[in-house]
Amino acid sequence: MKKKVLTFPSEKIGFSSDNEEFDLVMARGDYLAKNKSQKYMIIDMLGTGTFGQVVRCVGSDGEEVAIKVVKNQPKYYNYEMNEVRILHKLLYNNLNDRFVTIKDVFMYKQHLCIVEELLGRNLYTFLKMTRFKGLDHPTLRTILHQILEGMVQLSLLGIIHCDLKPENILIADYDTFKIKIIDFGSAVTSPQGSHFYVQSRYYRAPEVILGIPYGSSCDIWSLGCIGYELYVGHPLFPGKDNMDQIGRIHGLFGSLPMFMLEHGKNSSTFFEKENGYRFMGPPSNFTLEDMKKMIRSKGNSKEDDNMLIKFLLRALQPSHLIRPDAKSLASHSYLKVRDTSAEADKACNDRSGVQQNIFPANKNMRHMSTTGVILPSKKQKPTDDRRKISVYGISYENNLNRDSE
């Protein structure tokens, strides 16, 4: 019986095992072999994207895993080897409670294969399951606290993630809402200069856009954007390009710190030095008051809403120099649970307004979505244009829309 080919395009080029996009052509039932005794049988395709493919496999020991099969090109190999090095560093330091666990790495037919634990849905998929109505305070509080725990651990090792976003935060346990952070391909281990953009655009810090040397505070900015999106249901700064992105940030706060505009090597691209730096793009009509109204419009606890607003505004300080670090932000009053049992019960059982029956009854079925990719059913419509999900949580089609430029 002919095996079902999972890779598209499925035509191999010449005598190679790759298609025209440098992806390994794989079929259900094929094996990815590290050696003669250690093989992984391919069960299903979990996602495809800019850097390659992710397949669900079962190992020789019967354990199900997710394997990233990287495109057969040096630039993608180098990118993913950066993630391998950082994941090994986290594993060596026993810091895998908040991060995806790397299990193995090997080469197969000139493709880098990264074996990782199988996880659940990412937070964007989970948000989609709420029909973008957003999460409630107990659930959001649980998630933000864990992300900050992970960020504190990263800071101890001098690691800057550089691509925090809902797609790169996966649910490891639906009963406790345990999450894990994935995708360290863009991560760095020291403060960086301003020679290239990092971060997906919706979550990109102003210092990165302006071309100012950045550090771990850029991750704090991303966290603030994530917090708003998870609660309200849509991104805070859905910029179409960097001009639109910095314009939305500028519009929300009314202005940006003068020293950032003076020292940003890209400032002249967005601002004209006339009467104190005039923004050259179209004005944004979404103000700080609009942001507060959106949060309060959900009709939840006013006290919680107000504390969340204060939390987000601390994380979203336009100046990276006064933005709090992860340890400081983790002690914010919004994250302090007043009634632990009540909060936990609500976070674990209410599912933030998500219908109970959308959660698979059996945990093995929960593992059907993994590694930051959305698993569309045959009846499901394609993901909307603003987020073309890829293997590594990075936009598909050359990072168009929210991730590019």
Curated annotation (Swiss-Prot):
Coiled-coil parts of chain: none
Alphabetized PANTHER family for the sequence: DUAL SPECIFICITY PROTEIN KINASE (PTHR24058)
Keyword terms: ATP-binding, Cytoplasm, Kinase, Nucleotide-binding, Nucleus, Serine/threonine-protein kinase, Transferase
Enzyme Commission number(s): 2.7.12.1
Domain Protein kinase: 40-335
Swiss-Prot/TrEMBL catalytic activity: L-seryl-[protein] + ATP = O-phospho-L-seryl-[protein] + ADP + H(+); L-threonyl-[protein] + ATP = O-phospho-L-threonyl-[protein] + ADP + H(+); L-tyrosyl-[protein] + ATP = O-phospho-L-tyrosyl-[protein] + ADP + H(+)
Identification of the protein by name: Probable dual specificity protein kinase YAK1 homolog
Keyword field contains ATP-binding: yes
InterPro entries, per database record: Kinase-like_dom_sf (IPR011009), Prot_kinase_dom (IPR000719), Protein_kinase_ATP_BS (IPR017441), Ser/Thr_kinase_AS (IPR008271), Ser_Thr_dual-spec_kinase (IPR050494)
UniProt-annotated catalytic positions: D163 (proton acceptor)
Binding site for ATP: L46, G47, T48, G49, T50, F51, G52, Q53, V54, K68
Gene (name only): YAK1
Family classification: Belongs to the protein kinase superfamily. CMGC Ser/Thr protein kinase family. MNB/DYRK subfamily.
Function: Negative regulator of the cell cycle acting downstream of the cAMP-dependent protein kinase. Part of a glucose-sensing system involved in growth control in response to glucose availability.
Cellular compartments per GO CC: cytoplasm; nucleus
Keyword match Nucleus: yes
